[in-house]
Amino acid sequence: LIDKTLREGGQVLYLLPEIALTVQIMKRLRNVFGDRLGIYHSKYSDAERVEIWKRQLSDNPYGVILGARSALFLPFSNLRLVIVDEEHETSFKQQDPAPRYHARSAAIMLASMCGAKVLLGSATPSAESYSNALTGKYGLVSIMTRYKNIQLPEIQVVDVKDLRRRKMMNGPFSPALLAAVREALADGRQA
């Protein structure tokens, strides 16, 4: 998708939840995209960040920006793809200092404003994103096999609000969850 976007003259914003993950992904992307890749995050000095900002405003902006939350605020002249890797991570939430925001939500809004596509990546999507996929608001691509062929978990969405309204819950856990935990423990499995 990144290569296709670049070939069509578009720009890509690739967001990671933590700066520590940047180095690993950067090496892979640098091998493919070379000097078309720009890295942007809060650990860079002010001077380094200003240089990236200036290049984004130039006639030769980066085709791909890889970064953490702060990369959302860079200028893009032709943003066409936004990738939010590990979208479920809580570190996408900016608490302090203000402004407080959720980078995943901000990325979706930025993409909407720019007419860009959004790819939310996660092997364990947030409940919000998974619900949006189940209701058709988002598309869903499922991983059918896991690393070393580990069995995929069965996911069951339970409307606990409805269960509470019908007085079918005595605590914070649904009857289905309690039954599954009891069954796992009875079989000697982890729960």
Q: How would you name each of these model-derived features?
A:
Residues 1-3, 26, 107:
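Motif I (Walker A/P-loop) of helicase-class P-loop NTPases
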Residues 5-31, 48:
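Conserved Walker A/P-loop ATP-binding site and its immediately adjacent core
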Residues 22-24, 47-50, 74-75, 90-93, ...:
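Switch/connector loops and helix/strand junctions flanking conserved nucleotide-binding motifs
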Residues 56-64, 69-119:
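SF2 helicase catalytic motif II
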Residues 9-10, 60, 115, 188:
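Glycine-centered short loops/turns at secondary-structure junctions
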Residues 106-191:
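Conserved interdomain linker/interface between the two RecA-like ATPase lobes of SF2 helicase motors
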Residues 27-65, 73-79:
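Conserved motor-coupling elements within RecA-like helicase/translocase cores
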Residues 37-46, 89-101, 163-171:
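Flexible beta-alpha connector loops of hexameric P-loop NTPases
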